[in-house]
Amino acid sequence: MHRHSLRSTAIGTKGGRVATLHIEHPISDLDTWLGAFNRFADARKNAGVRAQHVRQPVGDPRYIVLDLAFDDAEAAHSFKKFLEDVVWQSKDLSPGLDGVPTARVLEDVDPRRLQ
């Protein structure tokens, strides 16, 4: 399994909470999916992705889970819309996609509230 990650911080550069675009879906195979994912590296950077974590469930090579961290929820929602309206609508742009993605924008719970 390939691992891609950048450092993440708890506070966005705008002073707000970091937002995460959490995506998961079935894939045809990892190499095909990674080829498509890697072609969008500049799009992720230009959209403000600050960290990325790509994972697969143990024992399930045909499923992918990824978290993309943004400075704020607005940027995460904007990139989610781009994926839904452009990338996932085209087999040419998403050849490794094998099913319907689930995508949600998440924000961290204030760690001071956790015990």
Regions found by a protein language model. Give the residues of each.
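Glycine-rich beta-strand-turn "strand-cap" elements at beta-sheet edges
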Residues: H2-G15, R50-Y63, W88-Q115
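Short structural boundary motif marking the start of a folded domain
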Residues: R17-L21
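Generic signal for short, ordered secondary-structure residues
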Residues: H22-I23, K45, R55, R62
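Short hydrophobic/aromatic beta-strand micro-patches
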Residues: E24-P26, D67-A69
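Short, surface-exposed ligand-recognition loops at beta-strand->loop->(often short) alpha-helix junctions
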Residues: P26-A36
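Feature marks short, surface-exposed loop/turn motifs that line or immediately flank catalytic pockets
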Residues: D29-D31, V58, D72-E74
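Intrinsically disordered, low-complexity acidic/polar segments
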Residues: T32, Y63, A75-H77, R112
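An amphipathic, aromatic/His-enriched active-site/gating alpha helix that lines ligand/cofactor pockets
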Residues: L34-H53, A69-R104
